[in-house]
Regions:
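Bacterial N-terminal signal peptides
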Residues: 15-27
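Alpha-helical solenoid repeat scaffolds
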Residues: 35-433
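Compositionally biased, low-complexity repeat tracts
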Residues: 9, 13-14, 30, 229, ...
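N-terminal secretory signal peptides that target proteins for export/translocation
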Residues: 1-11
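Signal peptide processing junction and immediate N-terminal pro/mature segment
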Residues: 27-36
Length: 433
């Protein structure tokens, strides 16, 4: 055991050094000042001991070790202290840490701990106004307590707005919502209940959707129940449900959910047809565009693998995504549609349009290079040699990107000597992920 202990300490120190590097990179994106440098070997040893004490739930012992060390060690130990739900960190400790360490990782967890401590200490009256001035409640209890405080202090519109936001976002529980309505005698309208049901169903939280049924009028009860049943794997009369839907967005969501159900049941072609029908009915809600695209992406690739290239292209190109609804989903959709058009359908003109869309929305060197390279391939396939070379040159202007390096190999006279041109590994034709 004695022989093993130095190795264990060395491994622990190595892991902690990695943690320090991660935090330093997040906190100091540029070179830090001397006072902000990483711990020395001696300080790292103290940090290892303090972390070991925390791991053993000896929070007081860890603090005692850290108090004798420079600020960087004290801060790292305190970071773990305020992040843990079992450390006994006080609200003042958490609040002070957040104020002094704005860019540290794990901030969301620390804020959650702060709210829990605020409520546990019954500090809403004295500390709530400052705490919630710069952040929204994260818990149901926090939503309720802060709304009640605002309502009691003649901030009724602010209280109602907060309750509405928490309710639709699924932060406020049904029990706490009922507590609010009993206290304030101000129930939310049915449109907010419907919005909450929509959020619950997009998050695949069927129980949360079902508990709202009693708060809705009969026609909307039927719609929410139908969609919940579909997500539970139960067959429903889709036409009747769509007829009762209050908006085109709800119609599209019902059809989309049925497409997912059919896919899970192994009815692939029926699923493709329904997904395309959903596309024709309404665009996806911006908040759930990524989920919408994930299903389209899966189905398009499944269709492509089955040799149904035309269907695959339709699923990728007709998803009705925009750069404003979800930039990540939009970029993925445009690339996949362009790739299928070029490689599988031999329609470079269509492909060029998608790669141009990709280029127009690109926000990073990697995406710019990718868009320019594939646009160049589409132009080359169309016989537009000069324009293709211009596009390859644009991609090569991003030499750190994979497609920038590939583009060098497509240029007859690259802007650097051949021996200096960076080499790409892998094949572009395989990269459709």
């Amino acid at each position: 055991l004695t022989k093993k202990r130095p190795n264990l300490l060395a491994r622990a120190a190595s892991r902690i050094a990695g943690l320090v590097l991660t935090i330093s990179t997040a906190v100091f994106p540029v070179a830090p000042q001397a006072a902000e440098t990483a711990p020395s070997a001696k300080e790292l040893e103290a940090l290892t001991k303090a972390f070991a004490a925390q791991d053993a739930s000896d929070w007081a012992g860890a603090k005692a070790i850290a108090e004798k060390q420079p600020a960087v060690v004290r801060d790292l130990v305190q970071w773990r202290h305020v992040s843990s739900s079992s450390s006994g960190a006080t609200f003042d400790e958490i609040d002070a840490f957040l104020a002094a360490h704005a860019n540290w990782p794990g901030r969301s967890q620390i804020v959650l701990r702060g709210e829990e401590t605020l409520l546990a200490g019954a500090l809403v009256e004295t500390r709530g106004p400052t705490w919630f001035k710069s952040r929204q409640p994260r818990t149901s209890a926090g939503c309720l307590a802060w709304a009640k405080f605002q309502f009691a202090h003649e901030q009724k519109s602010e209280a109602l707005s907060g309750v509405r936001r928490c309710w639709i976002a699924l932060t406020l529980s049904l029990a706490d919502y009922q507590d609010w309505t009993n206290a304030a005698q101000t129930p939310l309208p049915e449109s907010d209940h419907l919005a909450r049901a929509d959020a619950a169903l997009w998050n695949r939280n069927v129980p949360a959707a079902r508990e709202l049924v009693a708060l809705l009028p009969p026609k909307l009860q039927a719609v929410v129940s139908a969609r919940a049943n579909i997500q539970s794997g139960t067959e429903v009369d889709l036409d009747d449900a769509v007829d009762d839907a209050p908006t085109p967005a709800w119609e599209a969501s019902l059809i989309y959910d049925e497409a997912v159900r059919q896919r899970k049941a192994g009815k692939t072609e029926e699923s493709w047809s329904l997904l395309l029908k959903a596309n024709d009915t309404a665009p996806p809600p911006p908040a759930y565009a990524q989920a919408w695209w994930s299903e389209h992406n899966l189905q398009a690739r499944t269709a492509r693998d089955a040799g149904e290239h035309d269907t695959a292209y339709k699923l990728a190109s007709r998803s009705r995504l925009t750069a404003d609804t979800s930039i990540t989903a939009y970029l993925d959709a445009e690339f996949l549609a362009g790739w299928i058009a070029l490689r599988d359908l031999d329609e470079p003109k269509k492909a060029q349009v998608h790669f141009q869309n990709l280029a127009a929305a690109a926000r990073s060197p990697i995406t710019r290079a990718r868009a320019a390279y594939w646009k160049g391939l589409a132009l080359k396939a169309r016989g537009e040699t000069k324009k293709a070379q211009e596009s390859f040159a644009a991609a090569a202007a991003e030499p750190t990107a994979f497609y920038g390096r590939l583009a060098f190999e497509m240029l007859p006279n690259p802007p650097v000597a051949a021996s200096q041109a960076p080499k790409a590994s892998g094949t572009a034709s395989e990269d459709i992920k």
